[in-house]
């Protein structure tokens, strides 16, 4: 087959399902605790037994509206719930309560920083079609999984059924797998900052379905849309998109049909595979739920909830760059997790310099956090203590080397760096007379090196600095040591 000259345009949209972090389910008081024994968090409402009526959890509405506001969506003053009819083992009622034609919020956007390897980082505005509330389905556990070792059949766990979801539907504004992954990551970041969801993809708290098609040019009609499921990481989203783009282009260029279907991402084989044909909205036979009244959100309530929104990641990134002088990279890393950003700001407020605070937090502290599976708000080493250590480095009381030496104990136990330095006798030697005496001894001990230095081999200054640090166990003030060494060696 000859190589095609067609420059295909990729069109991607994401449906992001965010489990809202309420203690009880969307229409009942049943618990939402993750990881408990199967089918222990169900009740007559979850199962849709005769005589039961759903009642909307008010916290779900609050979380959904706050999420919508953070995504710049317009909040509907009036919306409703609908029944989505379909038969599947994980749906105990044989219908799902969702929102169809009158969602809680529509027409929003977010800006996403896209960093592709080997390319310059750029910012892209991604439109968001809508956000609607719905209940989650149960979870099928299939034969051969870790949970059903040795089993030859599948079972269903209804603990997840009825958990509150906010489904966020993007507009088809994404053009690469990387853009799709960055968009999903930013949505999760926002949800975590708001505190409406933990966004844990491994536990299913955030799940993304990708809708993807290709067309020859931007002026052509959209191609046949394919939905991809079963991606539990941002890298999986990117890889699934990249594989599917190649698959569809190859099919079109070979004269084959691209079917409208749902496909699964196979992480092991790194490919998508057909799951089922894709249903249209008419197949679900939506109609208003007769057991649930309309949802009214007053202007007063909207303003109250808007006033409670925290500073969001994009605003923080901008502030860190413009006001604190941090690089775009540092600002991006620091704001990835709200607990890291909060820790950083507390250190700066305690007097730590912004750049050095960022370096220590994104370096040594972040590595410790990751290896010990902690968050920054679980650290024993308090922001005020890190600020104290940074000020000791700035004033020359300790060197960076000594700071790294005491850091492991501070991270594991916390405490005053100043006190720890005193207890260990690690304070810097800042007395010029003491340093001069040690340098005089070094000059007497290394006459050949002194002669070579004075003959023009200026690189030997590093040798003497090393010897001085060895003698003082790294405690000599580096700036003062260099000044005195230069003076003595030039004599």
Curated annotation (Swiss-Prot):
Gene3D superfamilies: 1.10.10.410, GatB domain, N-terminal subdomain (1.10.150.380). It catalyses: L-glutamyl-tRNA(Gln) + L-glutamine + ATP + H2O = L-glutaminyl-tRNA(Gln) + L-glutamate + ADP + phosphate + H(+); L-aspartyl-tRNA(Asn) + L-glutamine + ATP + H2O = L-asparaginyl-tRNA(Asn) + L-glutamate + ADP + phosphate + 2 H(+). GO terms for biological process: glutaminyl-tRNAGln biosynthesis via transamidation; translation. GO terms for molecular function: asparaginyl-tRNA synthase (glutamine-hydrolyzing) activity; ATP binding; glutaminyl-tRNA synthase (glutamine-hydrolyzing) activity. It comes from the Bacteria. Keywords: ATP-binding, Ligase, Nucleotide-binding, Protein biosynthesis. Pfam families: GatB_N (PF02934), GatB_Yqey (PF02637). Its EC number is 6.3.5.-. The keyword Ligase applies. Allows the formation of correctly charged Asn-tRNA(Asn) or Gln-tRNA(Gln) through the transamidation of misacylated Asp-tRNA(Asn) or Glu-tRNA(Gln) in organisms which lack either or both of asparaginyl-tRNA or glutaminyl-tRNA synthetases. The reaction takes place in the presence of glutamine and ATP through an activated phospho-Asp-tRNA(Asn) or phospho-Glu-tRNA(Gln). HAMAP family: GatB. Belongs to the GatB/GatE family. GatB subfamily. Heterotrimer of A, B and C subunits. PANTHER family: GLUTAMYL-TRNA GLN AMIDOTRANSFERASE SUBUNIT B MITOCHONDRIAL AND PROKARYOTIC PET112-RELATED, GLUTAMYL-TRNA(GLN) AMIDOTRANSFERASE SUBUNIT B, MITOCHONDRIAL. This is Aspartyl/glutamyl-tRNA(Asn/Gln) amidotransferase subunit B.
